[in-house]
UniProtKB/Swiss-Prot annotation:
This is Thyroxine 5-deiodinase. Residues 1-22 are annotated as: Disordered. The gene is Dio3. It comes from Rattus norvegicus (Rat). Monomer. Homodimer. May undergo minor heretodimerization with DIO1 and DIO2. It comes from the Eukaryota. Its EC number is 1.21.99.3.
Length: 304
């Protein structure tokens, strides 16, 4: 009897509970998945790091006022001197892309600025949107009622849909809003326009700049984002305005931080503007709209 009991004990220990390999296999798969993600993030950091270092070095140089004044006054060779435009009363209109102004008391190379630059470059690197490719149908939120929608819900048939990403604390975005408003007024018969309010470029508790026209902290909730968007809506053109989600899904999909312009037509990205502040050029959008209008109506439009 003792031998039989001992043998039964040994056999019982060797069998183990049924399905014991299930949790182990799940844990192994999870470990492999996390390892792959870590490798992908490490590889992306290695690719982005030289670009980030170059930007950080440029910001450090621009903290020397003599360099800042010389560099910011110099016009980029790809952006020729703009044409002088007159309104109906013969008065000179402001340019589409006024030069970026940075006050002397603003430091550009700080921990907060480097965090913001890294965040923007990372979003641009991982964005889903590319010119000529399909437009990401990311989630947006209506400011009235917090109703969830999709970006392509605002596209109507084959009409182009212009996306304008930005926030109140972004000086170039706000400085060029009047030029964007002129385009909305001129082309809204054939083109749809949508402003997407994203996370603040220069929140009062982040990368602070005295050049920002408003003092707004980072959004902690959709209510905060709605309050900021209403400030923009007071002086915004007569086009639809929606909010990015608190997960920043649209800004991530389009690499839109700090600000950016896109044109979507029939679900395809027809124009992808550069990432702000340097690449945010309303004049480029105007050129695209003029060409589209010429193709549509056969005559070159007169500038406002």
């Amino acid at each position: 009897m003792p031998r039989q009991a001992a043998s039964r004990l040994v056999v019982g220990e060797g069998e183990g509970p049924p399905g014991a390999s299930g949790p182990a296999a799940t844990m192994l798969r999870s470990l492999l998945l996390h390892s792959l993600r870590l490798c992908a993030q490490t590889a992306s950091c290695l690719v982005l790091f030289p670009r980030f270092l170059g930007t950080a070095f440029m910001l450090w140089l621009l903290d020397f006022l003599c360099i800042r004044k010389h560099f910011l006054r110099r016009r980029h060779p790809d952006h020729p001197e703009p044409e002088v435009e007159l309104n109906s009363e013969g008065e000179e209109m402001p340019p589409d892309d006024p030069p970026i102004c940075v006050s002397d008391d603003n430091r550009l190379c700080t921990l907060a600025s480097l965090k913001a630059v890294w965040h923007g470059q990372k979003l641009d690197f991982f964005k889903q949107a590319h010119e000529g490719g399909p437009a990401p149908n990311s989630e947006v939120v209506r400011p009235d009622g917090f109703q969830s929608q999709r970006i392509l819900d605002y596209a109507q048939g084959t009409r182009p849909l212009v996306l304008n990403f930005g926030s109140c604390t972004u000086p170039p975005f706000m400085a060029r809003m009047s030029a964007f408003q002129r385009l909305v007024t001129k082309y809204q018969r054939d083109v749809d326009f949508l402003i997407i309010y994203i996370e603040e470029a220069h929140p009062s508790d982040g990368w602070v700049t005295t050049d920002s026209p408003y003092v707004i902290p980072q959004h902690r909730s959709l209510e905060d984002r709605v309050s900021a968007a209403r400030v923009l809506q007071q002086g915004a053109p007569g086009c639809a305005l929606v909010l990015d989600t608190m997960a920043n899904s649209s800004s991530s999909a389009y690499g839109a931080y700090f600000e950016r312009l896109y044109v979507i037509q029939s679900g395809t990205i027809m124009y992808q503007g550069g990432r702000g502040p340097d690449g945010y050029q309303v004049s480029e959008l105007r050129t695209w709209l003029e060409r589209y209008d010429e193709q549509l109506h056969g005559t070159r439009p007169r500038r406002l």
